[in-house]
Amino acid sequence: MGQCYYNETIGFFYNNSGKELSLHWRPKDVVVVALGLTVSVLVLLTNLLVIAAIASNRRFHQPIYYLLGNLAAADLFAGMAYLFLMFHTGPRTARLSIKGWFLRQGLLDTSLTASVATLLAIAVERHRSVMAVQLHSRLPRGRVVTLIVGVWAAALGLGLLPAHFWHCLCDLDSCSRMVPLFSRSYLAAWALSSLLVFLLMVAVYTRIFFYVRRRVERMAEHVSCHPRYRETTLSLVKTVVIILGAFVVCWTPGQVVLLLDGLDCKSCNVLAVEKYFLLLAEANSLVNAVVYSCRDAEMRRTFRRLLCCMCLRWSSHKSARYSASAQTGASTRIMLPENGRPLMDSTL
């Protein structure tokens, strides 16, 4: 191991990797920050709504909904991490210390890893409940807690590794171009692990699809309700396509550029698209709320109830303020007497 550069500036590592460090706000930086702030706020609001719905509705106190709540918590964390990134990017990157830079990246890596790992946990739990022919699985709560703790332990482990071990501060030749303080091998490992998660999800949902299709076909042999059979099959196909399609669209571009950078592809212009692909990966935290929660009819009813309650509270608060203001105004409408008779305000 060569010399270590713990006391160097962020600019030193960016220059070493050949990544431009902005000293002023460029149009590209403004566009990325504007889009990033918009996506982050939407992610925070939607996932807060999901968590509130699961907490307030006792029907959702089931293992699969605990996992959905954990997914919403991971995506909420991802929204906050990306919001933190947006306030420490562009020209502000150069002012970060090495510890601050690792904190910025660690928050993002931890939250996104937790989100991806929870997606796999949900797929496995759905597979288990379908094979057991249960609408809501009877998975023990202790096992769910263990699963959730395992997800966050793995996410924290992967998020903290670069700051403590898997960096390039002592080996500048191994530095990544996209993430100049990270080792290229870390990026390759992270991309391959995400790809492995996707392949496992494909395998799990494919097995669910064929199992349910065979079961419905056997039922259709004894019932003449063939349109219902086709409807069930098409609904299942739609669900699987949406789940896997959302993951592919949001994650594949980012995984590809991470892998290319990790493999040290000199001819690949990964820096031209990295910010937009990271934004697309963050958008998955918004898509998850729609795909996994909003398609549930009971969840939608709970959303409407919560939003109606919020609107009613806001309206009642506004009405109370208006009434208080009106009473105050009425008490000041009596004018000074003139010729022995009190004058009333002409606005009455």
UniProtKB/Swiss-Prot annotation:
An example Gene Ontology CC term for this record: presynaptic active zone membrane
Parts of the chain that traverse the membrane: 31-51, 67-87, 105-124, 145-165, 186-206, 240-260, 271-291
A Pfam family this chain is assigned to: 7tm_1
Subunit text: Interacts with SLC9A3R2/NHERF2, MAGI3 and PLCB3. Interacts with RALA and GRK2.
Described purpose of this protein according to its UniProt entry: Receptor for lysophosphatidic acid (LPA), a mediator of diverse cellular activities. Seems to be coupled to the G(i)/G(o), G(12)/G(13), and G(q) families of heteromeric G proteins. Plays a key role in phospholipase C-beta (PLC-beta) signaling pathway Stimulates phospholipase C (PLC) activity in a manner that is independent of RALA activation.
Residues with lipid group (S-palmitoyl cysteine): 308
Membrane topology, as annotated: Multi-pass membrane protein
Protein name: Lysophosphatidic acid receptor 2
GO molecular function: lysophosphatidic acid receptor activity; PDZ domain binding
Organism in which the protein naturally occurs: Mus musculus (Mouse)
Glycan-carrying positions: 7, 15
Similarity field: Belongs to the G-protein coupled receptor 1 family.
Cytoplasmic-side positions: 52-66, 125-144, 207-239, 292-348
InterPro entries on file: GPCR_Rhodpsn, GPCR_Rhodpsn_7TM, LPA_rcpt, LPA_rcpt_EDG4
Gene3D superfamilies, alphabetized: Rhodopsin 7-helix transmembrane proteins
UniProt entry keywords in alphabetical sequence: Cell membrane, G-protein coupled receptor, Glycoprotein, Lipoprotein, Membrane, Palmitate, Receptor, Transducer, Transmembrane, Transmembrane helix
Extracellular face residues: 1-30, 88-104, 166-185, 261-270
GO biological process, one term: positive regulation of MAPK cascade
Entry superkingdom: Eukaryota
Renumbered ranges of motif PDZ-binding: 345-348
Location of this chain's protein in the cell: Cell surface; Cell membrane
